[in-house]
């Protein structure tokens, strides 16, 4: 009885090691970050102030432009807002949801979460009415947009993941700009 119990335990432990070993084993030579391809840019203007907020805020994004790498252009159409959350002083979680109308009349619904973390220069630049840029007011500013549409022309957008990198935030002038990149998937 003791021998069969020992054998069963040994088989079980060996199986678990084999299974978990295959699940967690990684090949460092092939463990590469995904590649990115420039997709376009996104600019919001007429950003409404999130007045008197202590943590959560809603900032209306009154107008803006989505410019695709192929030259197609879309404009913000309501609704469009950032339902943000101030985590710490000058550290924001972004929760943006917007509708864009393309020149051909197609509608794109863009939504994303992200992080915007300012550096030590941010307050001084804001007091002087100067814009924030990476390494000059912004320490980290990234988001992960998804797009939904019923347009046949833009249907491919339903199946891609974008990464947005903040380029400039000029809150005194009321605009921000992102560069957008498409994540390129590699077949395994």
Model-derived regions, located:
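Bacterial N-terminal signal peptides that target proteins for export
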Residues: 1-11
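Bacterial N-terminal signal peptides
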Residues: 10-19
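Bacterial Sec-dependent signal peptides at the C-terminal "C-region" and cleavage site
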Residues: 18-28
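Beta-strand-enriched cores of mature, soluble protein domains
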Residues: 26-188
